[in-house]
A protein has these predicted regions:
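An alpha-helical, amphipathic repeat domain used for nucleic-acid recognition
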Residues: 1-141
């Protein structure tokens, strides 16, 4: 079995380089501790206490990145965060930090770029709507 302090030190180093959610760290700790759930839980709590792991900070960074760089909408972001095990209140708070005006501009530019390819298609409007929904934008926006 791996030594507790070595695993803790390695995970602290990893967390200092990038953001991780609690579920990811728990999986890493379980693997490193060879399935010892109690020790992995203690490691996770210590990392939370020392602010190496913070689900709100992770969710906010994830939402900003996916919104700005990949053009995802709030629905797709919230589903992705829920799949990571982030609770609903944290997801709502993280999505609330996204600037609505910037998100609208990104949505508009993504849809306009797609429209250039669909303009001559008889089902172009339907396909554009479907594309926007698949990107995580709401129907009424």
């Amino acid at each position: 079995m791996a030594e507790y302090s070595k695993v803790l030190s390695r995970l602290q180093m990893q967390c200092s380089k990038r953001e991780y959610c609690s579920r990811d760290i728990m999986q890493k700790a379980l693997k490193a501790m060879e399935g010892d759930a109690e020790a992995a839980g203690r490691i996770l709590e210590e990392l939370r206490k020392d602010r190496f792991v913070d689900d709100l900070r992770y969710a906010a960074a994830f939402a900003r990145e996916k919104s700005r760089l990949t053009g995802w909408g709030p629905v797709k972001i919230s589903f992705a965060l829920a799949a990571k095990g982030i609770d609903r209140d944290t997801v709502r708070e993280a999505i609330g930090e996204i600037d609505d005006a910037d998100a609208f501009r990104r949505m508009k530019s993504v849809l306009l770029a797609k429209w250039k390819f669909l303009r001559d298609d008889p089902q172009g409007r339907f396909k554009l709507l479907k594309f926007g929904l698949s990107r995580g934008y709401e129907y009424d926006v």
